[in-house]
């Protein structure tokens, strides 16, 4: 699969309205034509007023066909675009790939009703959303270290991989990895435990040292319609 990875900066205070429009119209229209929602996040700590939505397609041809189909859908250009566009200040997009060890989400995800356990669980979850820039040619070595060492260590402390992407078109030599936590306390406890794990300090860190150029991180929330790892 390939992924259309979109980061939008919204007008201050516009995130709830944008999220509601996505849930009520945009999501349905995209899914109707075959786009798979791989993630929907909004910033809590970091650069504020940002939303990230990630859409999966079988290949580049499928992406072109699906995007042409939903852009031509009357519900898109008559209802969704007029509602969403005035809320958006800037847009950035990348085409990303994902490795075999990353989760793949179904085209349509069940949306829990307000107040249900599933709804409350998603509202409590937090996501450590990390974008790393690497030296040219370094991503394969980093990917191997992540799969063989970092992911098993994080899993040991209840941390789940929500997404792992590397850039194909856009800003190159970048990896975005997204880690799911039950709540803020779990995030703090798990990160402390991972950092203190001897395998992390003795095996993982030496393998990736020297590969990175820059690191950026956000604390993000998801929505009731955003897919999350089991």
What is each PLM-predicted segment?
Residues 1-202, 206-230:
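Short S/T/G/P-rich N-terminal loop/turn motif that feeds into the first structured element of a domain
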């Amino acid at each position: 699969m390939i992924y259309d990875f979109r980061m939008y900066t919204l007008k201050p205070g516009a995130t709830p309205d944008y999220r509601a429009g996505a849930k009520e119209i945009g999501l349905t229209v995209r899914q109707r034509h075959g786009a798979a929602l791989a993630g929907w996040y909004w910033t809590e700590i970091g650069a504020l007023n940002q939303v990230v939505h990630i859409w999966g397609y079988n290949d580049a041809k499928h992406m072109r066909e699906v995007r042409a189909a939903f852009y031509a859908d009357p519900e898109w250009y008559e209802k969704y675009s007029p509602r969403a566009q005035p809320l958006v200040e800037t847009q950035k997009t990348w085409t990303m790939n994902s490795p075999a060890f990353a989760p793949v989400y179904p085209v349509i995800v069940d949306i829990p009703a307000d107040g249900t356990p599933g709804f409350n669980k998603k509202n409590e979850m937090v996501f450590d959303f990390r974008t790393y820039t690497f030296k040219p040619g370094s991503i394969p070595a980093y990917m191997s270290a992540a799969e063989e060492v970092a992911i098993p260590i994080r899993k040991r402390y209840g941390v789940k991989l929500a997404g792992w992407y590397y850039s194909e078109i856009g800003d190159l030599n970048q990896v975005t990895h997204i880690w799911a936590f039950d709540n803020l306390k779990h995030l703090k406890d798990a990160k402390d435990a991972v950092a203190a794990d001897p395998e992390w300090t003795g095996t993982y860190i030496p393998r990736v040292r020297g590969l990175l150029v820059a690191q950026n991180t956000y604390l993000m929330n998801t929505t009731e319609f955003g897919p999350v790892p089991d």
